[in-house]
Curated annotation (Swiss-Prot):
Cofactor entry: Mg(2+); Mn(2+)
Cofactor note: Magnesium. Can also use manganese.
Gene Ontology biological process: mRNA catabolic process; response to heat; RNA catabolic process; RNA processing
Protein name: Polyribonucleotide nucleotidyltransferase
Source species: Escherichia coli (strain K12)
Length: 711
């Protein structure tokens, strides 16, 4: 029989329910987690045996949103969910990052976590629910996992931290921060903020970590009740003799190699040392495992770099702990793009462009929480040549999507509001060289490219990656880490922001015991680095250009009477289509009567504005207009008087004598002066040529207010 084991608890303003034992009983563990009607079903399957020769930990996290959760049918051609969206990929990474460091060293059995969103309350984001579910399922499974973890979202509204704010509350919040950690320590932070201070950000991390303890306690209680026996897994015994033999052959040589400051040269030398060491040892004993020797050598490398940093010696490339690599900043490097920049920091380089488009270029995202439009796009590309390798080139991988989102978060806080700058903006960062922190180089490059494009960003932003090496109570925080320092260190800590505050913070911690004090030191050191980079960037460009690129569309905005919108659009869109073809512009009309005309040529925009003003102009009774004969009928003639408006000149109003035949007086296409006699309730216009000729001078079409140019 199905015997569900259920645990309920209050978590901030929400009620969380954990349920296991009901579904997916052939999986290693399965949990249904719900938080106020948002429910995520999370399963874990772990293989009891590792694949022979497996030398890394094969953990896969899949996060999938089902549209039935929101009571909808997919809008795709096949009416079925397809490959993961960008949002799903980012949440899969969010789940993966805090759980990965909690598996023991040497554990290489395959583990797969699948989180499926099966019900959604539009006010409760499923990401936190999925993270709690993954933590609970892994803890129940018996797989060696040093959890559980808790997860919390923290907002900052009216100078107060808010635990797990609703979607509506998030719109008012100056902060959107997700923090995950164990009972003892924070493991991961992912956030965007509206330029908050270091203390405010650190306070949010600490607040979120304290509040999530209730989740950890309840998962532990559930494990006592429903957990599976812990696997009897033991790491391979350490071969001390072999370790000593490898160290004797390679340690001194590797130590020397890590004094080579050039990355390519250093890599080449390290490869030579490793292959010579392995060849020597295999010649002595053919039964040795090459993979095992590689792992021992990697551990020696790690130890060499870490012990040198902790001893206060210069880093791999000769820098002190808080030194930034040499910077080279250039703007306007590509002639036809709307804005461009080349940002180089040591051996990391990003070519960044900014492109301006109209509102119809905005991305419409059909998400589970509802449809939304994004007018700021940020795409990050990491080609294999950037690290001197060959490889596949194609659609973006998880890492590229994640780095693009982080860089976007870094810039978002300074982007202008749509009503001040009515453009869709796309930033693309091409990483042309990489040795550490390419996502933060993308933030710096984006800030420069946006200024070069004339986008009125509120402030320049820069980003920096920090690292940490910690042994016991001894620790060193490193500024502007290299790729090697990232792999061999204990923390990766990326901070982006302006002179006034932080716009994005991302932290991944690989060890336990990172205290509030260490995070404080890292944040303060990052601020110094950020201000240094901003100083160099400001020498290249210190404010957005006064004008947008001549190749970018200029958006002119005019207001019309909302009642006249139907006249500008016409039947089935006929008038607006004809207008765009005639004037060579893009025209967008909003419900409140705001009309946006986009054109690369100012004359075309003026022509479009003039035509719209003609169409929407009010017809004045008693006024004389110059019109054109469009139709001749037995009882008179129809005359167009501009703006798509047409009136009837009755046969009795053509001349001041009796008219037998209209065509004796009027021809098709003939221009004639006409006086407006009447506009009836249906908007029908009565005209007179007879009375117009009595008045000497015809009037032009009525004037409308001049357009303002949105630049």
């Amino acid at each position: 029989m199905l015997n569900p084991i259920v645990r309920k608890f209050q978590y901030g303003q929400h009620t969380v329910t954990l349920e296991t034992g009901m579904m997916a009983r052939q999986a290693t563990a399965a949990v249904m987690v719900s938080m106020d009607d948002t429910a995520v079903f999370v399963t874990v399957v772990g293989q009891k045996k590792a694949k022979p020769g497996q030398d890394f930990f094969p953990l896969t996290v899949n996060y999938q949103e089902r549209t039935y959760a929101a009571g909808r049918i997919p809008g795709s051609f096949f009416r079925r969910e397809g490959r993961p969206s960008e949002g799903e990929t980012l949440i899969a990474r969010l789940i993966d990052r805090p759980i990965r460091p909690l598996f023991p060293e040497g554990f290489v059995n395959e583990v797969q976590v699948i989180a499926t969103v099966v019900s959604v309350n539009p006010q409760v984001n499923p990401d936190i629910v999925a993270m709690i579910g993954a933590s609970a399922a892994l803890s129940l499974s018996g797989i060696p996992f040093n959890g559980p973890i808790g997860a919390a979202r923290v907002g900052y509204i009216n100078d107060q931290y808010v635990l797990n704010p609703t979607q509506d509350e998030l719109k008012e919040s100056k902060l959107d921060l997700v923090v995950a950690g164990t009972e003892a320590a924070v493991l991961m932070v992912e956030s965007e903020a509206q330029l908050l201070s270091e203390d405010q950000m650190l306070g949010a991390v600490v607040f979120g970590h304290e509040q999530q303890q209730v989740v950890i306690q309840n998962i532990n209680e559930l494990v006592k009740e429903a957990g599976k026996p812990r696997w009897d897994w033991q790491p391979e015994p350490v071969n001390e003799a072999l370790n000593a033999r490898v160290a004797a052959l390679a340690e001194a040589r590797l130590s020397d190699a890590y004094r080579i400051t050039d990355k390519q040269e250093r890599y080449a030398q390290v490869d030579v040392i490793k292959s010579e060491t392995i060849a020597t040892l295999l010649a002595e004993d053919e039964t040795l495992d090459e993979n095992e020797l590689g792992e021992i050598l990697h551990a020696i490398e790690k130890n060499v770099v870490r012990s040198r940093v902790l001893a206060g010696e210069p880093r791999i490339d000769g820098r002190e702990k808080d030194m930034i690599r040499g910077l080279d900043v250039r703007t306007g490097v590509l002639p036809r793009t709307h804005g461009s920049a080349l940002f180089t920091r040591g051996e990391t380089q990003a070519l960044v462009t900014a492109t301006l488009g109209t509102a119809r270029d905005a991305q419409v995202l059909d998400e589970l929480m509802g449809e939304r439009t994004d007018t700021f796009l940020f795409h990050y590309n990491f080609p294999p040549y950037s690290v001197g390798e060959t490889g596949m080139v194609g659609s973006p991988k998880r890492r590229e999507i994640g780095h693009g989102r982080l860089a976007k978060r870094g810039v978002l806080a300074v982007m202008p509001d749509m009503d001040k700058f009515p453009y869709t903006v796309r930033v693309v960062s091409e990483i042309t060289e990489s040795n550490g922190s390419s996502s933060m180089a993308s933030v710096c490059g984006a800030s420069l490219a946006l200024m070069d494009a004339g986008v009125p960003i509120k402030a320049a932003v820069a980003g920096i990656a920090m690292g940490l090496v910690k042994e016991g109570d001894n620790y060193v925080v490193l500024s502007d880490i290299l790729g090697d320092e990232d792999h061999l260190g204990d923390m990766d800590f990326k901070v982006a922001g302006s002179r006034d505050g932080i716009s994005a913070l991302q932290m991944d911690i690989k060890i336990e015991g990172i205290t509030k004090e260490i995070m404080q030191v890292a944040l303060n050191q990052a601020k110094g680095a950020r201000l240094h980079i901003l100083g160099v960037m400001e020498q290249a460009i210190n404010a957005p250009r006064g004008d947008i690129s001549e190749f970018a569309p200029r958006i002119h905005t005019i207001k019309i009477n909302p009642d006249k919108i139907k006249d500008v659009i016409g039947k089935g869109g006929s008038v607006i289509r004809a207008l765009t073809e005639e004037t060579g512009t893009t025209i967008e009309i909003e419900d409140d009567g705001t009309v946006k005309i986009a054109a690369t040529d100012g004359e075309k925009a003026k022509h479009a504005i003039r035509r719209i003003e003609e169409i929407t102009a009010e017809i004045e009774v008693g006024r004389v207009y110059t019109g054109k004969v469009t139709r001749i009928v037995d009882f008179g003639a129809f005359v167009a008087i501009g703006g798509g408006k047409e009136g009837l000149v009755h046969i009795s109003q053509i001349a001041d004598k009796r008219v037998e035949k209209v065509t004796d007086y009027l021809q098709m296409g003939q221009e004639v002066p006409v006086k407006v006699l009447e506009v009836d309730r249906q908007g029908r216009i009565r005209l007179s040529i007879k009375e117009a000729t009595e008045q000497s001078q015809p009037a032009a079409a009525p004037e409308a207010p001049a357009a303002e140019q949105g630049e």
